[in-house]
Each structure stands twice: as C-alpha cells, then as structure tokens.
Amino acid sequence: MAEVVIVEQIFDPPLTDEEHGRIGKLIDRCAGMRNATWMRSYLSADRRRMFCEFEAPDAQSVREAYRTAGVPFQGVWSAELYKR
C-alpha cells in the first residue's frame, strides 16, 4: 500500500517558474521509476520554501528519486493525512 510522503525544500535564491518546471520534470521521471507519484506542492509566498506531497511505497523511494535527479532537499518523511 502506498504511503503519503512529504518532501521539504529550501531555495536561495527564490524558486523561479523556469527552475520549478525543470526540476519537476527530473523528479517526475526518477519518481516514476520508483513507483512514486507527485500529488501536490505548496510553495511559500516568498518562493523560498516548498513542501511536496507524493504517494510512494516509502520515504526512501522518494529520497532516492531526488538524489538520482540531483535535486537537493531538506527532509523527506512519511506522513498521515488529517482533514476535516
């Protein structure tokens, strides 16, 4: 069963639309090879922090995808979704 996996990233300088598109393509390709699927991202208003949500077998699969893509990250962890 797939887990919810969260990735935290910090950008300095702030993330541009061009860079977002470039890294998104790299991560999609590498994540797909590990049965991980990007679901959504939350980018801070100043474009310096982003949290991405994946459905994946485990957090390690997503870490490996980011490392293979050469995209830095601050942290990757499995999470539980709580909503109203």
Descriptions of predicted regions:
Residues E55-R84:
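An amphipathic, aromatic/His-enriched active-site/gating alpha helix that lines ligand/cofactor pockets
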Residues M1-M39, S44-R48, Y82-R84:
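Short S/T/G/P-rich N-terminal loop/turn motif that feeds into the first structured element of a domain
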